Amino acid sequence: NGRTVLIAPWICGLAQALSASLFYRAHKLNKESSLTNLAEKALNIFNYSIEDGGLKTTLNGYDFYEEYPTEPSTYVLDGSLFIALAFYDLYLETGNDSLFNSSCEGITNNIDYWNYKNQWSYYGNFGYLSSIQYHMLNTALLEVLFNLTNNMQIRKTIDKWKMFHNSVLKKLFIFIAYYYSNGKYTLLNRQELIRFIKRKILWTLLLLLLL
């Protein structure tokens, strides 16, 4: 909604990361060396800053790898987690763990950036909460990252973000906070709000009650 500038043609960090992970897994099946070369080329863009046409920026002094090379930065959590896992694939294949370590430092040292009242995740930089689908994805990806790093800050965050399962009141609180934050930060007029309500409120409430 006009809060960032994304200049075409632009590079998607998530697409680069998923492509690299796919190439590495395909290489394990057929041992074709050209696939690892493609994977490394896909990840090379993360060595360059957004200003230089790449996907690297900083968050509170730590390197951060973006899903979208925007100005200002979006800091989308799930995108950065997928990127970190692609860097882990790079490490397994080549032994080079510099990008993986750098991305983990950026995420773990800033994990409270995406933490809403120790109960839920923010989607990214602009003040609105993750949908329930993205929140569950964020939690699942953090579980994978914890299994790889054994970082207790990640473990504590996961445990906090799962606590909503235990309380109907917490589910109701998140339900209200989610729609308030999304309505406040992403919707520009009354018609958009009405469409948003019709499309998502009943579905989200049903999911929260079932979980």
Label each PLM-derived region with a short phrase.
Residues 1, 36-58, 97-119, 153-176:
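Long, well-ordered core segments of solenoidal/helical folds
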Residues 1-11, 56-78, 116-137, 141, ...:
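Carbohydrate-binding/catalytic loop surfaces
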Residues 2, 67-70, 84-90, 94, ...:
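Long alpha-helical, hydrophobic tracts
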Residues 2-45:
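Hydrophobic alpha-helical segments and helix pairs
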Residues 10-28, 74-91, 130-147:
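Well-ordered alpha-helical segments within folded domains of soluble proteins
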Residues 27-31, 47, 51, 91-95, ...:
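Hydrophobic/aromatic-lined pockets within catalytic cores
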Residues 42-54, 65-89:
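Hydrophobic, aromatic-enriched interface-forming segments
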